[in-house]
Amino acid sequence: MTTGRNNRVMMEGVGARVIRGPDWKWGKQDGGEGHVGTVRSFESPEEVVVVWDNGTAANYRCSGAYDVRILDSAPTGIKHDGTMCDTCRQQPIIGIRWKCAECTNYDLCTTCYHGDKHHLRHRFYRITTPGSERVLLESRRKSKKITARGIFAGGRVVRGVDWQWEDQDGGNGRRGKVTEIQDWSAASPHSAAYVLWDNGAKNLYRVGFEGMSDLKCVQDAKGGTFYRDHCPVLGEQNGNRNPGGLQIGDLVNIDLDLEIVQSLQHGHGGWTDGMFETLTTTGTVCGIDEDHDIVVQYPSGNRWTFNPAVLTKANVVRSGEVAAGAEGGSSQFMVGDLVQICYDIDRIKLLQRGHGEWAEAMLPTLGKVGRVQQIYSDSDLKVEVCGTSWTYNPAAVTKVAPAGSAVTNASGERLSQLLKKLFETQESGDINEELVKAAANGDLAKVEDILKRPDVDVNGQCAGHTAMQAASQNGHVDVLKLLLKHSVDLEAEDKDGDRAVHHASFGDEGSVIEVLHRGGADLNARNKRRQTPLHIAVNKGHLQVVKTLLDFGCHPSLQDSEGDTPLHDAISKKRDDMLSVLLEAGADVTITNNNGFNALHHAALRGNPSAMRVLLSKLPRPWIVDEKKDDGYTALHLAALNNHVEVAELLVHQGNANLDVQNVNQQTALHLAVERQHTQIVRLLVRAEAKLDVQDKDGDTPLHEALRHHTLSQLRQLQDMQDVSKVEPWEPSKNTLIMGLGTQGAEKKSAASIACFLAANGADLTIRNKKGQSPLDLCPDPSLCKALAKCHKEKTSGQVGSRSPSLNSNNETLEECMVCSDMKRDTLFGPCGHIATCSLCSPRVKKCLICKEQVQSRTKIEECVVCSDKKAAVLFQPCGHMCACENCASLMKKCVQCRAVVERRTPFVLCCGGKGMEDATDDEDLTGGSNSMAGGSQDLLQPNNLALSWSSGNIPALQRDKDNTNVNADVQKLQQQLQDIKEQTMCPVCLDRLKNMIFMCGHGTCQLCGDRMSECPICRKAIERRILLY
């Protein structure tokens, strides 16, 4: 058994932020002096696992030698109730408490202590945990300070060992910047870091909470300074000790003269005549008060308080019980020694305080003989006795002389009896352990033999598990059936609350679950985490067990302690097969977890398109797709916010999600996509005809958001285009920024391109927010304002939809030079194949204005080399030459310039950024290819293919059809909701009267039908009791 002391250290240490300790000998594993890490777990009382901020994880010593110190234990949640930091007013103090030794009732938290608050000359007590020994420290003025380095504000990070947040960071290896150290929860301060990723996403991640490390530092930052030698050593125990080394349970004598004792007692409890008994009697330390005075209890039952200087620690081993021939052996224990446990229960309870503590389960060991397994650094003994291991105060045991010692006949007989008693105890004391082990190994014969013994407990435990649980997890059906014949408790729980059916689920034993079900086991039983066997089966990926549980009627939608149903877990584990099975069994998609996410929300948040596809295909009610969280977010909001494009497409096209639902801030999914500059989501929503002029709580439309972002990022955009912007402000007709929306690279996102796209699709430029600002008021760039106005005008006048893709198009936009606007485009850029400028402006352009690719070659477009009548107007691929007009190019199978086979012909208008009839990449604009960007960017101005055939006269008719469709959908939704209400409230038998009688199985009918029935019409269980509803 692990000692109470070690259990406490291990429990309280997980999550602590640590630095290298006094016995460090591991080089720069931690990154160097002052670098910080997190306690992840304890391998044993002697070893701790630390994950350093640089990503290194290793075991370190925390007993005997101490490799780490505790810098901040606040993330562990240790709190000192009734205290308050007198500087920052934190109440209660969480982490280490620093109490001024020179001021009355003045405390500091760790941050304020190392931050040099209060007088630096004053000495402080360090109190690591509530009730622990306070340690007096030197004044900070004389102490050395070191700078902490690691995951702090300003540091650069990537995902760490405990990362479980999908691709929020943009993908494995992507970097982000820590902006602030925050609290993951109110009970765990300084346990998280807020990170702004390079892809623009930002969120909070665990750095210490429950020992988790979501991040790894690639460029550390400074986290302030600290007093290294004032930080406690992890694992070093000084609780319940005084400066003299006395502990609770120690035996003490008084060896001083009466006059000296009386003098030392002044101010330490004084002296009375009743204390004379203490001069000749050995007492036991039973307490240490706040002034470090020692409370001693004597055999008479009296307790006296002493100055520690008065007392002398007595010898803990009573050598009188061991023969004199065992010289030297009686004063010291060794591993392997035989020892007898004290008989006196009252005495051993007192002695065990601070030495592993007393447990009622230790009662059978009194007076028994055991063997020393381990000796701890504080001299406590780990003794194996009666088939179990416990930690004892050395004063609570008596050493049995070794077999070879010179003993008297009497003592030799006594030793022989004790050894015989030892072996008898091992045989009888291990019977439950033997039963559990035999059941775990599937040894049917041995289990049967053990069960015949009268002293066996069929529900007895070994290592916290019963024989039934062991057999269930290992799939031993024959053993299970035998145990069931002996009235085993099917619902017995282990320390985690798991029952036999939980163990069967964990071990992937479907046949065991069948046996347990027939035996009457509760398949919906929950453990301490509120998990059912179905939760465990889903999390472990045991599909057959999931099917078995559902076949036997296991409830498919029970929630665990975090509110997650098996559906949530299946989505998290990306198990679409289990998802389908659960939905077919009637799992409720609408149940929300503790964070307010139902299954659809969860799939959208996780960015799991396959799960979303399954959910949408099996939705019992179509409107569930628009269910809101408590903050008003729908699944579409979450997909738009996190840039999960595939999920959003499924919600829009397969789920027919309402595009204009508003959250509590009155934001639509389009607001969120524009705010995060997720161009693909913006395009998807606009093409699906989302309303462009919905206002949020501040009155802002998506266009307001886009232009606000443009203003903030304008300097960076100008820097990207510095080679062009020096010539002349760009004209709206050039569509330069509109082309940028077709580019999917993270560096190419442009709020201005989104703004132009919204305007080109009819966004209102005059609508004002609550501050009285129109979108144009938020745009200080007159050129962009002009572009927006022209895009909007083209939309309203029908020009957007009527652009001809013909090579003979008179569209001046595609013919004008994008730099000077005076000359026509006549220069082919290589290698991208775009035509953007005239020959005079082309030398100034370093990057293609359409795709932003580096320009490596410039070729002026000449006459057709075949007919010499027209200009060359078709780009041959893959050679990249433009040497023939449209008519001549259609006849060629090889390029006349290089004789390469022509695999593809790209029209002039497509090279200019327009849309051509021969563009084979019309649906590939999402992939980000150069041609697809050029072809798709013009398509951005067309919400859907109907735009080509619309005229100004028939738009209202189409709008009316759309409105009628929406009304019909709303009516259908209301009708179905009404039908659901009827099904829930009407009697399922007669279908005429309201349901007002409920049976014990949970089903119900009307009273008239219920009174005539003996079994439930739904589940066919016998009706034991009827309850009327009022």
UniProtKB/Swiss-Prot annotation:
Specify the domain of life of the species encoding this protein: Eukaryota
What top-tier enzyme class does this entry carry?
Answer: transferase
Enumerate the residues binding Zn(2+) 1. 85, 88, 109, 112
Gene3D superfamilies reported for this sequence = 3.30.60.90, Ankyrin repeat-containing domain (1.25.40.20), SH3 Domains (2.30.30.40), Zinc/RING finger domain, C3HC4 (zinc finger) (3.30.40.10)
Q: Which UniProt keywords apply?
A: ANK repeat, Cell membrane, Coiled coil, Cytoplasm, Cytoskeleton, Developmental protein, Membrane, Metal-binding, Notch signaling pathway, Repeat, Transferase, Ubl conjugation pathway, Zinc, Zinc-finger
Q: GO molecular function: any one?
A: ubiquitin protein ligase activity
Q: Does the keyword Signal apply?
A: no
Q: Where are the zinc fingers (ZZ-type)?
A: 80-132
The UniProt record lists the MIB/HERC2 domain at 6-74, 143-221
Fetch the SMART domains from UniProt. ANK, RING, ZnF_ZZ
The molecule here is called E3 ubiquitin-protein ligase mib1
Species of origin: Danio rerio
Lineage summary: Eukaryota, Metazoa, Chordata, Craniata, Vertebrata
This protein's encoding gene: mib1
